[in-house]
UniProtKB/Swiss-Prot annotation:
A lipid is attached at C20 (N-palmitoyl cysteine). The gene is nosL. This is Copper-binding lipoprotein NosL. Monomer. Apo-NosL can form homodimers. PROSITE patterns: PROKAR_LIPOPROTEIN (PS51257). May act as a metallochaperone involved in nitrous oxide reductase assembly. Specifically binds Cu(+).
Length: 193
């Protein structure tokens, strides 16, 4: 009798606990960038880098992953590293009113699968790699091609090689690189050197 009563009490407690669980729909509304918004790969402030940005919402994650280049977001989506299914990808519409290369905008997010991309243009993204420049309008993308070169493609037509191939960003060290290396050389060596 005691075992039966214990079983009934445990079953009732489990039923109550499962009834308390609320299924809350995850928000996938695009979020604006702030001074605290960091790129997923580079962990650098996105507002300090030019060019269009992207954000990816993963199932179960409270906030999106931001990317300093659209190219990087497409590469992430095609790679094996996702920790959860992708719900949606948003990209800056570079044809939106007020969007510039230095200020790609907020509030002009469009679904990545609906965008038209200019690939192979003279423009480089925020991390110095070739960029897949998104537009909500094919006509805006075509106008960008006339000014900057490249070709207009749908997301499905962008090949893996266009976003996954390593890119040389220049072999000449920049002045700030030399300054940094000089400061590193000036540090005392841990072995007493």
């Amino acid at each position: 009798m005691r075992t039966r009563l214990r079983f009934v009490l445990v079953a009732a407690a489990l039923a109550l606990l499962s009834a308390c669980k609320e299924d809350v729909a995850q928000s996938i509304v695009p979020q604006d960038m702030t001074p605290e918004t960091l790129g997923h790969y580079c962990q650098m402030n996105l507002l300090e880098h030019p060019g269009p940005k992207a954000q990816i919402f993963l199932e179960g994650s409270p906030a999106p992953l931001f990317f300093s280049q659209v190219r990087d977001a497409i590469a992430y989506a095609r790679g094996p590293e996702q920790i959860a299914p992708i719900l949606v990808i948003y990209v800056n519409d570079m044809g939106a009113a007020g969007a510039t290369w230095d200020q790609p905008g907020d509030g002009n997010w469009i679904a990545a699968d609906k965008a038209f991309y200019v690939v192979g243009s003279a423009r480089r993204g925020g991390m110095g790699a070739p960029e897949a420049v998104p537009f909500s309008s094919r006509d805006e993308a075509a106008a960008f091609v006339l000014a900057e070169g490249g070709q207009v493609l749908a997301l499905a037509d962008i090949t893996d090689a266009m976003v996954l191939t390593p890119v040389e960003t220049g072999s000449e060290p920049r002045a700030d690189d030399e300054d940094y290396l000089g400061r590193l050389r000036a540090l005392p060596h841990p072995a007493g050197g």
